Amino acid sequence: MYVVSFLDRANIGFAKQALQVSAGISDAAYAMGAGLFFITYAIFEIPSNIILHRIGARVWMCRIMVSWGLVSMGTMFVAGAISFYILRLLLGIAEAGFFPGIILYLSYWFPNRVRGRVLGLFYFGAPLSFIFGGPLSGILLAMPAKAGIQGWQWMFLSEGFMAVVVGIWAYFYLGDKPADATWLPGPEKQALLAVLEAEEQARRRHGSSAFPAVLMDWRVLHYTLIYFLIQMSVYGVIFYLPTEIAAFLGKTVGIEVGFASAIPWVCALAATYWIPRTADRHQNHRFLAVLVLAVSGFASVLFPAGTPIIALFALCVAASGFIAVQPLFWTFPTSYLADTAAAGGIAFINAIGALGGFFAPNAKVWADVHFRLHSAGLYLLAGLTLVNAVLIAFVHQGKSDGKSDALLSI
């Protein structure tokens, strides 16, 4: 599901040049349209996640994926800036609640002590989508027009259709909570439920469980600022990675750039496996998150200043860090929030954080124009990454319940 989600997020980056040629969209209009998705996505996040909490993941995840797949398919009909803006706004409404819904859903099933590595496995979806999605998008873009449909239109049609199919599959596959899992043996189910209930009670005693009061909790606001800056870093890479790689290769965005764009995400896949597991093993999520962001920030500074080899190496380090730090981050709010505060609070953090995806391309364009330097925007985003490393150093880190040690290893 997450692979398909990120395919949908990334295809707009691959379609940038084609949209500008076919639909007459300027750099500024592209940046605005790419970012508008996050406005409606943020507005509808909280109500969507509360609905999921009430009616269950199976039905709601199906609704989200089918609707966003249909809207994504509709992007093939973009004919100018206005239609591009409208479809990006509709896509934000359709996809709202997917990501925080998954984070909430995993908190129903996995205790604190193993949640980092579980979230790391979930986050495999991002680099996997870029590893396979980059070449796939490049191949589709390079297709000659068939039946009056150009390559970039085939890309949106094919990848949107995948979301519809996976959404229907999710309806029949997902179970809402462990208590509903008929495949889980009785003793294991009871042990898991006991651990999860003990942690829920601990969160109610020491964390926050009331919504909407959680929105004024200083820790939640701290988490939100951190996640906002993480998303600025992530989307600064996602939206511009294909065109930046094309620039230093001296190519147009197509098959070769698609394969080259997959290299940083192969590195990110390895990092997303190893870093969260290491953090869970040593229970040092905060320290590793600070280290990862600091290294990624310095790598981002090297990217625009280096040779093609150094630039590609810097992209590999930055992409790895920006993806791998996210499962570490989500262990903080999920160990602090309980009940409806978890549903609303996680959605709030993700909703405001997702606005980083709106500000990243626009901040990059502003900095490039203001300082009359193509790499100024990348330096700005790199600096914000280093600031974020400092913010994480002061984050509140929830405590695992000792009973979770008894859980079977994953």
Task: Locate the predicted segments by residue.
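Extracytoplasmic gate region of multi-pass secondary transporters
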Residues: 12-13, 212-276, 326, 330
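Helix-breaking motifs and short loop linkers at transmembrane-helix boundaries and internal kinks
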Residues: 24, 56, 77-83, 94, ...
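Conserved MFS/SLC helix-loop-helix module at the cytosolic interface between two early adjacent transmembrane helices
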Residues: 43-82
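Helix-to-loop junctions at the C-terminal end of transmembrane segments
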Residues: 44-57, 270-283, 368-369
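Cytoplasmic membrane-interface "Motif A"-like loop-to-helix N-cap segments
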Residues: 53-65, 280-293
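Cytoplasmic helix-loop-helix junction between adjacent transmembrane helices
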Residues: 87-124
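Glycine-rich segments within core transmembrane alpha-helices of 12-TM secondary carriers
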Residues: 117-141, 162-163, 350-360
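C-terminal transmembrane helical hairpin of 12-TM major facilitator-type secondary transporters
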Residues: 283-332
